[in-house]
Every structure is written in C-alpha cells, then in structure tokens.
A protein has these predicted regions:
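Acidic/His- and Gly-rich active-site-bordering loop/insert found
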Residues: 2-91
C-alpha cells in the first residue's frame, strides 16, 4: 500500500475528532479508548494483530477515564520496529 495525502488527512481528521483528554482535574479527565479503538481498526484492516492493554500506574480509573495502550504487531520474525506516541491531549 502506498500512503496518500488524502488518506493521511482522513485519518488525521478522524483522530482529532475523538476526545482523549488527560488531566489531573477529574472533571476534565476522560478515556482515550475512542482513539485506541480507531487506531486498532485502522491497523487491523492492514493486517496487524492488535492488543489493548490497560495503562499501568494510573489510579482511580473508571470506564469514563480509563487509559489504554495499543500494541499492534505484524509478522513473527526476529527484529522489528517500535513506534511510540501519545493518544491523549493535555489541557
């Protein structure tokens, strides 16, 4: 698959449209699950296996503010590539 500019902007718009605020203020803090679910859908459509993992070290999580990590893998050989990024916004 060759990446294209319209495809990039479509995904960028979709990511920006999903709220994922991390805040010490409990009134603002929300889950990043909508972003993780979207990314998993995109990766799975491209042949990746995805695993959602609860983020360690976060206290007092409820379903409304649960923080998740996404691990997407493809292939089984030695070596590989790791990409890491944030899926939340901080006010």
């Amino acid at each position: 698959m060759t990446p294209s500019t319209p495809d990039f902007f479509t995904h960028l718009d979709a990511l920006i449209a999903r709220p994922s605020i991390s805040s010490a203020n409990p009134d603002l803090d929300i889950s990043n699950t909508p972003v993780i679910d979207y990314l998993a859908e995109v990766f799975e459509a491209r042949g990746f296996s995805c695993e959602r993992v609860k983020s360690p070290g976060t206290s007092a999580q409820t379903q409304d503010n649960e923080k998740l990590n996404l691990i997407a893998t493809r292939g089984t050989g030695p070596g590989g590539l790791v990409l890491a990024g944030h899926t939340d916004t901080v006010p």
